[in-house]
Curated annotation (Swiss-Prot):
It is an enzyme of class 2 (transferase). HAMAP family: UbiG. The gene is ubiG. It comes from the Bacteria. One of its GO terms (biological process) is methylation. S-adenosyl-L-methionine binds at R43, G77, D98, M144. Pathway: Cofactor biosynthesis; ubiquinone biosynthesis. Its EC number is 2.1.1.222, 2.1.1.64. This is Ubiquinone biosynthesis O-methyltransferase. Keywords: Methyltransferase, S-adenosyl-L-methionine, Transferase, Ubiquinone biosynthesis. Belongs to the methyltransferase superfamily. UbiG/COQ3 family. GO terms for molecular function: 2-polyprenyl-6-hydroxyphenol methylase activity; 3-demethylubiquinol 3-O-methyltransferase activity; polyprenyldihydroxybenzoate methyltransferase activity. It catalyses: a 3-demethylubiquinol + S-adenosyl-L-methionine = a ubiquinol + S-adenosyl-L-homocysteine + H(+); a 3-(all-trans-polyprenyl)benzene-1,2-diol + S-adenosyl-L-methionine = a 2-methoxy-6-(all-trans-polyprenyl)phenol + S-adenosyl-L-homocysteine + H(+). O-methyltransferase that catalyzes the 2 O-methylation steps in the ubiquinone biosynthetic pathway.
Length: 257
């Protein structure tokens, strides 16, 4: 398993500052995070489908019909809470964690305005630190669009494994590393189409599916599914497909002993 040291926080301060400066934009659906709002229904449905297919409860019964409803969910790197809120609305009991204090203020305020305080809460804590005190406490863990922003993504994946109860499902998303992903995710998204602010991504931190698969296996997970997320700039339409050349999501499961 990846070595995990809680004292050495696995974070790039410049990345935290970058997103803190944009904290006021999280719930502006036409602002800096418009792309996240647009893809949120796709990723939410894919997460729920994988929970239905993979989650196994303590009594070894697959609760396929329930999906996210009734599950304890941890959203790692929750930002302003776009995905966290959506999962809470599906009936999950959600905890979102992030290291950006301004992000969490925006997330908490919006949750209060949306009357979701009973099923949604936020904490300012590294995932490794939470794993040291809350191992095995969650049915589902999500870590979306975060791994390519940290120094040691393997440690994040390892912490996600520790936090899951046996039989739980973890969904990860990141960006593949190849010439096509550089062209689409950086040149296209940041400079040509301006879907994202310039400097949002660092190509060297992109992660291939093989690398993420190895991180997951080393942590103890078994692979469940993988899917690519695609965008047509002419029609402004997003969809899921098997091609994982650029953005992709991976669902993995913690085996039940």
């Amino acid at each position: 398993m990846a070595e995990n040291t809680v004292n050495a926080i696995n974070v790039d301060p410049s990345e935290v500052e970058k997103f803190n400066k944009l904290a006021g934009e999280w719930w502006n659906k036409t602002g800096a995070f418009a792309t996240l709002h647009e893809i949120n229904p796709l990723r939410l449905n894919w997460i729920e489908e994988n929970v239905k297919c993979g989650y196994v409860s303590a009594d070894h019964q697959k609760t396929a019909e329930m999906g996210l409803a009734g599950k304890k969910v941890l959203d790692v790197g929750c930002g302003g809470g776009i995905l966290s809120e959506a999962m809470a609305r599906r009936g999950a009991d959600v905890t979102g964690i992030d290291l950006g204090t301004e992000n969490l203020k925006a997330a908490s305020l919006h949750a209060e305005q949306s009357n979701l305080q009973d099923t949604l809460r936020y904490q300012h804590i590294p995932v490794e630190a939470l794993a040291a005190t809350h191992a095995g406490q969650f049915d589902v863990v999500t870590c979306m669009e975060m791994l390519e922003h940290v120094p040691d993504p393997a440690a994040i994946v390892d912490a996600c494994f520790k936090l899951l109860a046996p039989g739980g499902v973890c969904v990860l998303s990141t960006i593949n590393r190849n010439p096509k992903s550089y062209l689409f995710a950086i040149v296209g998204a940041e400079y040509v189409l301006r879907l994202l602010d310039r400097g949002t991504h660092d190509y060297a931190k992109f992660i291939t599916p093989a690398e993420l698969d190895k991180m997951a296996i080393d942590a103890g997970f078994t692979r469940q599914d993988i899917i690519g997320l695609h965008y047509n700039p002419l029609t402004k339409r997003y969809w899921l497909a098997q091609n994982v050349d650029v953005n992709y999501m991976m669902a993995v499961q913690k085996p039940r002993a």
